[in-house]
Design a protein with these regions (language model features):
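Short non-domain terminal segments
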Residues: 17-22, 38, 54, 82-83, ...
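Short intrinsically disordered terminal tails
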Residues: 1, 101-105
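Extended boundary segments
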Residues: 1-44
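Broad hydrophobic/π-residue packing in well-ordered secondary structure
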Residues: 1-8, 49, 84, 91
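Short, compact, well-ordered microdomains
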Residues: 67-102
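Short, conserved turn/kink motifs that form compact alpha/beta structural patches or helix kinks used as
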Residues: 29-78
Length: 105
């Protein structure tokens, strides 16, 4: 599966949403792509997001070149099916395109 992983940049996190769940994030203005940075882009041996979560939480499984922290709540995984917010339990599909170059509306 080809994926991109985005994580909230600590320098850009003005609303203190790092590691916060989707509902909390929505109550505080929603997911703003401009607060995120790309930490991985590439292919992984996975068919499901849960496997992606396992790979990026198991040091020995992480691909070479991965420069992020372990995959956690508030991270966004983008694949051919869309953008998915890593929530407290599972993933929540984001309804809008996740574009880090675009301001939130």
């Amino acid at each position: 599966m080809k994926i991109k992983i985005y994580q909230i940049s600590t320098e850009k996190d003005k609303r203190n949403l790092l590691f916060m769940g989707f509902e909390f994030t929505q109550r505080h203005g929603g997911v703003d792509p401009t607060e995120y940075e790309l930490v991985f882009e590439g292919e992984v041996e996975a068919k499901h997001l849960e496997t992606v979560f396992y790979i990026f939480n198991t040091y020995s499984e992480m691909p070479a070149g991965y420069r992020g922290r372990s995959l956690s709540v508030s991270d966004v995984v983008v694949n051919e099916d869309g953008a998915f917010f890593c929530d407290s339990f599972g993933f929540t599909k984001l309804l809008e395109e996740f574009d880090v170059g675009k301001e939130a509306t």
